[in-house]
């Protein structure tokens, strides 16, 4: 599901309203170091912004995955406002799940920061 173009073609062929995608902001790694499946660094990535744009046409859900924040509450590994504007521009009105996969042992501050950033961008 990391190759949005391929997944979009699958969705077109399925062509059923009850079949959709879960657009995950952090799921665009095409190949990892040593061809590992998980855990190894990503060495080839599908363009995140293009992928989100392509998959939003089929979105039944969105997973706002984050990894790191600066002192001002901005996600530092990707352009969250740009992504959320893609989601909004697609007319999505469903649920946005919150995920945090940062290095901290306690994920709750990261999830709270993610939620706050979503609210800041989408409400303002």
Segments the model singles out, each with a brief description of its role:
Residues 1-85:
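Acidic/histidine-rich catalytic cores of soluble enzymes
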């Amino acid at each position: 599901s990391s190759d949005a173009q391929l997944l979009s073609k699958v969705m077109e062929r399925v062509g059923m309203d009850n079949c959709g995608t879960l657009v995950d902001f952090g799921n665009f790694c095409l190949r990892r170091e040593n061809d590992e499946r998980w855990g190894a660094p990503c060495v080839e990535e599908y363009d995140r912004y293009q992928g989100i744009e392509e998959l939003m046409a089929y979105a039944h859900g969105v997973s706002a995955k984050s990894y790191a924040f600066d002192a001002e509450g901005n996600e530092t590994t990707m352009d969250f406002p740009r992504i959320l504007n893609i989601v909004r521009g697609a007319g999505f009105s469903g649920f946005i799940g919150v995920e945090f996969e940062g290095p901290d042992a306690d994920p709750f501050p990261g999830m709270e920061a993610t939620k706050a950033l979503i609210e800041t961008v989408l409400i303002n």
